[in-house]
Amino acid sequence: MSAFIRLRLHILALLALAAVIAGQFGSFFWPAELFSHFLPYYAAIFILAAFWPRPKWRTLWLVYAAASLLWLAQPFILPDAPSGGTRLVWYNVHLDNPAAEAESAALLAEQADLLALGEINLDNPGWQSLRQAYPHGCQHREHSPFALAMWSKQPLAVCEVRMIGDYPYIRAQTADGTALYALHPPPPISSELAEARQHYLAETARTLAAEPRALAVGDFNSSPFSPLFARFLQESSSRPATRYFTPTWKPFFLNIDHALAKGLNVSARTLPWQHSDHRPLLVEYTGQ
């Protein structure tokens, strides 16, 4: 039985290693990129293979397990929440959320200064208490997963919905000149949607790069282990505010909701799961 398990763990570890390598070619072939998102599971397989090894393979699987854990633990240093900072909640609320009133109450209890909301059904009266508490801002009304809103308690200097093809993003600007972005590219579930997501991320990265001080939040439909996400960070000159292993989306518990900062002191943490398949992110920031 022990030899039986070792052999199958070894085969699983070889397949996991192949998946890690394949995922890094996702910029060239969209199905390959899908493999990149499951690094937490590959790490677990490498650990099991290292501690229940076939002869002569322990060192190899220990190396890959350690490398995977180091990747998952990035960024290694995260700042504490800045004192007196602005509070923003990003939340993909799910288009068909069955408990909008309860969700609204939970969001109001966070006492954030701003809300950025994805997949919000603006025709659902359960969200009206939020709109009353956050009367400023703008939204893209659409009965689809690409409805988007950026709401604020205080007036914003700018708030506009911009389109990249069929897909919106929001750029707002506070009175102190900080740019705020709410992003939600399409999921890469077909070649057409994968190409649209790649174009969306490339365009918003270029726009973000031109900002001296900015915060981008959203459901990127991309994990930190994707080469497209790495390219976005590089081209936008932004940095992530949550650790890569942080799960934000069910059912696979992957990290696809992000808060990315540029020229700001930022701290972010997940809030408890509610009635959506995503977790909210609470972000606090100040200028550097």
Located regions from the model:
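Soluble catalytic domains of enzymes that build or remodel membrane lipids, polysaccharides, and related
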Residues: 94-108, 119-288
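N-terminal, active-site-proximal structural segment of metallo-dependent hydrolase catalytic domains
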Residues: 2-129
